[in-house]
């Protein structure tokens, strides 16, 4: 079964996938390393060279996204709000052209998504998200953002409800990112639809954090 990519959200055609995606985004406030539906890279030993590379990424990112502190500028520049009407701890404003570019090359000034929190009068910029293609190796990821500095993650082991099932028919404790089903065998037994991985590899960065340990933290 074909996987779903960051650049192909379609809430009307695939509402189950949309709900799962929202659950995945919401799970960023949880301990993702403990989730059966999340894989995170292991931190590699620190090195001065990696710290220098990470600093260079931030030096390119900060001025590139400074204007997007006004979220309306981000919208005007082609960023689209993912699930704007669904309450979320963080809202992803995604630039699908940058997402496509990220499948082939890494440009620190072109994050796939901007991360905002909702405010009374709009949105406040918190950070950004870089992506890499699904099939990228950990060495590929390390070449972009050092694995000694940041932990990339991917969303895995997703079992969606049977196609056409209504919410009344679905046990939400079993399906989706918050569900207990985390193997293909169990998913097939439940009549669900199995996705070994959805979306690309991702890594969040919060360049305005004063605490260095929180800049690359989830």
Name every feature range the model reports, one short phrase each:
Residues 17-114, 118-218:
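Primary mode marks residue(s) on the alpha4-beta5-alpha5 output face of response regulator receiver
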